[in-house]
Amino acid sequence: MSIYTDHTWEGVTYAWQNVTMLDSIVTYRGTRVEMIHRPKWGIACYMDNAIQSCEIDEALYHESLVHPVMSSVSCPKRVMIIGGGEGATAREVLKYPTVECVDMYEWDKDVVKLFQSKYPQWAKGAWDDPRLHLYHDDIFKTIEEYPVDQYDIVIIDLFDPSNATYDSWKHLLKHINKWVRSEGSVVMYAGIRERTSSEQSYEMLANMMMTMSGVMDDNILYKNRITPYRVFVPSFSGESTFLLLSSNTDFKIDHTIGSHVTDLVWKSYQTFNW
């Protein structure tokens, strides 16, 4: 009997029985990527032994990440995605007919190649959409530059915020404002809500942005309202949290594109003790 041990949470180990290892690679960026089939749960992606996505419930995460921010801007045309190597974030963005250009910055091209060649069920055709443009640059260097054209929406789909990644997040958030037009919006994955932790990752990011709003006079982005929300994703064994920055505070989710996210998502933050 084959067993895969999952060490996503510190001090906790999950043992998945009767698994099938479909792929195990080390990317040129040094990340170990494992694609595993788990009975009843389907195929899951692990990076450095931490769960990243599972085909049975990835839509819960990706729809929650994308549809609120897409609904916050009237007729969004230009969208920037930071991360999102499975292609599912792009899949949800490209459902909007007003979108003309999606620039996706995923620095690990080996992850993209793996999902393009073997696991198309995540992207569901997004890779072939001519509106999607892929870049494998280091976003933390690219972000220091000034863009040729600003975006209506920026979606940050990166690693969990933590003390170890604090400086990287601070650097990214310091420079991202010049990539977004003044009426645009930004959303970011803000980590898993940990009931056993006294310091939540979404609080760290929110505090970082609120500090920036007070010291960066030219940073219009962080003058906007920060709206937190969350969704429970079974594969993550916890609640994924998100932060939305938008000057538009009066909008509803666009249901014409088949989103399963309801407007009740905004009430989810009320249990945060924000």
Describe each region flagged by the PLM.
Residues 2-37, 210-213, 227, 233-274:
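SAM/dcSAM-binding transferase cores
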Residues 40-41:
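Short strand-connecting beta-turns/loops that link adjacent beta-strands
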Residues 46-47:
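A general beta-strand register signal
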Residues 216-230:
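Conserved short secondary-structure elements within globular domains
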